[in-house]
From Swiss-Prot:
UniProt name for this protein: H-2 class II histocompatibility antigen, A beta chain
UniProt keyword terms in alphabetical order: Adaptive immunity, Disulfide bond, Glycoprotein, Immunity, Membrane, MHC II, Signal, Transmembrane, Transmembrane helix, Ubl conjugation
Membrane topology: Single-pass type I membrane protein
Family listed: Belongs to the MHC class II family.
Region (Beta-2), start-end ranges: 123-216
Modified how: Ubiquitinated in immature dendritic cells leading to down-regulation of MHC class II.
Organism placement in taxonomy: Eukaryota, Metazoa, Chordata, Craniata, Vertebrata
Gene name in the database record: H2-Ab1
Entry's transmembrane regions: 227-247
Record GO biological process: antigen processing and presentation; antigen processing and presentation of exogenous peptide antigen via MHC class II; antigen processing and presentation of peptide antigen; B cell affinity maturation; cellular response to type II interferon; immune response; positive regulation of alpha-beta T cell activation; positive regulation of antigen processing and presentation
Beta-1 as annotated region, ranges: 28-122
Length: 265
């Protein structure tokens, strides 16, 4: 689906250049009209949320320069456009502004007014807490709250310790773009875990009816060892149970002897 960008957003700017011909040409001082057009286009691929931004520069109804966001730079369509394309590509400000229009123009329209609800997208975040180093009580450590695969970009992530918000020792990465338009962010909390403490990562996002809260509890090394021992015991129990059932099944079949003598006559 191609959406024409409104004129106020550089959709179709038509500039008519009035050039007076030199005396003696075209039979006198008659005016000549040269038409220069600029057109911007946003292409939304149905079902994929992928956007492609294309700008076309047209002189006297002939396109001579084109910018394609899939290419990332201006390309000359005709020899007339080669000097302009080379110049625009050599200017970081121009190239950066043109590349940014994928967001400021196309994505702005996509996320735009509520009247365009058919184009809106909401993706709920996934939230996971991890510890940067092997757990040890009363030693400095870092909790990492990984918030991934959410859209739109607006999100609020907070840390709580035993129900009280933590503001000291909190840091965050910049929003990281995924290839499918979704985002991810990491929010870290510098802390010293003590037995019985409960840390909570609290996430608010437009896609959620209520915030997501994920807890992490500080455990002593003995409690951690007991938990691992319990898991290991369960695994060994399942293995021995399966082995016993297999041996019993084999023993119930019994050895097969030769057929009765009467059947051989």
């Amino acid at each position: 689906m191609a959406l024409q960008i409104p004129s106020l957003l550089l959709s179709a700017a038509v500039v008519v250049l009035m050039v007076l011909s030199s005396p003696g040409t075209e039979g006198g001082d008659s005016e000549r009209h040269f038409v220069y057009q600029f057109m911007g286009e946003c292409y939304f691929t149905n079902g994929t949320q992928r956007i492609r931004y294309v700008t076309r520069y047209i002189y006297n109804r002939e396109e001579y320069v084109r910018y394609d966001s899939d290419v990332g730079e201006h390309r000359a369509v005709t020899e007339l456009g080669r000097p302009d394309a080379e110049y625009w590509n050599s200017q970081p400000e121009i190239l950066e502004r043109t590349r940014a229009e994928l967001d400021t123009v196309c994505r702005h329209n996509y996320e735009g007014p509520e009247t365009h609800t058919s184009l809106r997208r909401l993706e709920q975040p996934n939230v996971v807490i991890s510890l940067s180093r092997t757990e040890a009580l009363n030693h400095h450590n870092t909790l990492v709250c990984s918030v991934t695969d959410f859209y739109p970009a607006k999100i609020k992530v907070r840390w709580f310790r035993n129900g009280q918000e933590e503001t000291v020792g909190v840091s965050s990465t910049q929003l990281i773009r995924n290839g499918d338009w979704t985002f991810q962010v990491l929010v870290m909390l510098e802390m010293t875990p003590r037995r019985g403490e409960v840390y909570t990562c609290h996430v608010e996002h437009p896609s959620l009816k209520s915030p997501i809260t994920v807890e992490w509890r500080a455990q002593s090394e003995s409690a951690w060892s007991k938990m691992l021992s319990g898991i290991g015991g369960c695994v060994l129990g399942v293995i021995f149970l399966g082995l016993g059932l297999f041996i019993r099944h084999r023993s119930q079949k019994g050895p097969r002897g030769p057929p009765p003598a009467g059947l051989l006559q």
